[in-house]
Amino acid sequence: MTASGSPSKGRAPSATAEQILDLAETLIQTRSYSAFSYQDVSDALGLTKASIHYHFPSKAELGVAVVDRYVARFGAALAALDQDEAKSSMALLDFYIQPYLQFAKTADRICLCGALAGEMMVLPPEMRMRVEHFFTTHHAWLAGILERGVQRGEFTLPAPAIKIARLVFSALQGALLVKRTTGDMAQVKDVIAVLKAELTPPATR
């Protein structure tokens, strides 16, 4: 912990801080960053506001910590996939898609950074920067997998890989929002099915 009580870089948060982070992540995914307060955290976890402020002196610091943890979690998974030369490019894409399917199975959760993007103009600058980084990192990773798929004869692309990567990412994020509105799981499953079909070479469909 730092002198202010915030988790310091390179040091694992305490169990209480992790509880706060877990809840804040869920609240952002289901309500929005703007729509939750320290009072919500206090009520849900039975903590005093002073205790919450000890770990995260400001809501902006809590928001940054939530995004940093989320980005790191995704980043570690993507880095591990990059090292797996045995899996097909479609298998890697399927692995990437799994979190979207898991979110879609819930009544109200969506991607954390997708949720934050919807209120980008009211986020603290340090959070906006991290959300933008999440997007560009995922665009780049997807583009790499798509290019690998083309080189191996597993994918066919109608446009440059980075453009298709942006299409895939935006389609998945948007499908989650529509599914949350309609409650229809097909909103996500159909988008995924069409994306995969369009990437598959005609001879192997």
Predicted regions and their residues:
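N-terminal intrinsically disordered/low-complexity leader segments
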Residues: 1-15, 205
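Amphipathic alpha-helical packing segments from all-alpha helical-bundle domains
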Residues: 75, 90, 94, 106, ...
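Short helix-capping/turn signature of helix-turn-helix
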Residues: 56, 116-123
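A general structural signal for well-ordered alpha-helical segments in protein cores
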Residues: 38, 59, 63, 93, ...
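Amphipathic C-terminal alpha-helical segment
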Residues: 34, 103, 148, 168-186, ...
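Hydrophobic alpha-helical connector segments
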Residues: 65, 69, 79-109, 161-168
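Helix-turn-helix
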Residues: 19, 23-61, 65
